[in-house]
Amino acid sequence: MRKLLLCAAALLACGVGPAQAADLRDAWLAARQQHPGMAAAAAERAAGDARRLQAERIWNPTVAAQASAGAMGSRTSAQGAAFSLPGSAPVAGVGFETSVHSGPGTRWGIEARMPLYSPERSAQERQLRLSADLSELQAASLQQQLMLQTAERYFAAVLAEQQHALLVRQQQATDRALQEARDRFTAGDTPITDVREAEAQALATAAQAEAASVDLQIARRALAQTTGWDPAAPQTLRPPAAVSALAETMGAASALGPVTSWLDGAAHENLQLRTQAQLVAVAAQEAAKAAQGASTKVDLVGQAGAEHLSGSGRWGSASNAARQFMVGVQIQVPLYTGGQQDARAQELLRLQDKAQANLDSARLEVAQQVHATWLQLQAGVARAHALEAALKAAQARLDATQLGRQVGDRTTLELLRATNDALQAESQLLAHRARMAQARLQLLALAGRLDESALQAATDAGTPVSPSLPPSS
């Protein structure tokens, strides 16, 4: 007993026990940590946060400054001027001229501006907030796509493992049948044609096993690219869940529930539809930015500036200096844009119509996908029951054939056929469970309900399935 416990502990320490087998949720958690798709989703969310911050600050005041220096020249002339001196009468018809041919000059200015009213800016604010929400939806869509891709590659690896193991065992069985045929031919019990048929079957099975080995390597590498697992040390994967787990997976007491509930859920929660609806809202705000009167602006403005120029002019040394400031309200109303603004507004309205048409088309497509997937799952339940019954019948036939082989009523070839039939039935059931699991996840994704709990429920919590052959007698 002590030796048995030590062996069991050693197996568990090496990760061989069934408790160490990875399920679909484990694969997703690994993919979430390292797949570039999640980095893209995180970047999309960060971009959305930046757009939301832009919307919050779009009405904040702005301050701009400018300065310049260089060689400058200036000439001013005034005619018909008048001036007066203290204690003397005004003198009219006077002319003044100043000039600086070339000299050092400086100029600076500063302006502070705060928008008070702008339909275009208001539409831009709403558009930025909608774009921020759109980024969140797009990031969620990227995450959901990675979930479905992980599930697809996970189940592909499970089926490749199953098919490869099946063909390896079939190859072992055909090798035994070939050896038996050769022995019986040597003893004179069978003709040479039986040996040739056994050789042909052995070669065909070996070729199929080699092809299955290649498919298995491809499936493992594809899963490794998604999860970051080492393809040279593949994980033990849990098989897809049985059909009996359907009700728990779907969160309904009566299996799938009516298709109308899934259609309603998809109409409100489907990420593709929500994203497309958000694009329609963004297009509407883009059109509002170009609407008539949207370019009218009212700003609170404060300005200050100065200019200085010195040098020699026509009448000797000279210098000019000027300072100005202004605080007030500035109103800008476009009166005529040459028709370009109207054409731009028409273009954006048509683009809004296009976005709405794309949304209507997406609704039809999603509804069709929901209906088709729901029907597939409905039919799949009966198909699963039939395959389970076929597996039980094949196992019973295998047991009977094995017993008959022991008492001499059945031949080795009959035992091999019964064994292959049982393994094929097991493989078909596992493949159907994988298709059903993927269809369930797809339906949940269409309804916007795909999450980690659904991924975990998609795989069997029991011991990983491994096809096996009875010992040769």
Spell out what each predicted region is.
Residues 1-20:
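Gram-negative bacterial Sec-dependent N-terminal signal peptides
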Residues 38-55, 142, 146-165, 176, ...:
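Amphipathic alpha-helical coiled-coil segments
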Residues 129, 192-201, 346, 412-420:
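Short, charged, amphipathic alpha-helical segments
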Residues 71-73, 231, 428-473:
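Acidic, low-complexity, intrinsically disordered peripheral segments
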Residues 66-110, 241-254, 288, 301-340, ...:
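Small/polar, glycine/serine/threonine/aspartate-rich low-complexity segments that form flexible
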Residues 29-39, 46-61, 97-105, 109-127, ...:
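A glycine-/polar-enriched beta->alpha junction
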Residues 2-3, 22, 143-265, 373-376, ...:
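Periplasmic alpha-helical coiled-coil/stalk elements that build and connect Gram-negative outer-membrane
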Residues 41, 63-67, 276, 298-302:
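Membrane-embedded beta-strand positions of outer-membrane beta-barrel proteins
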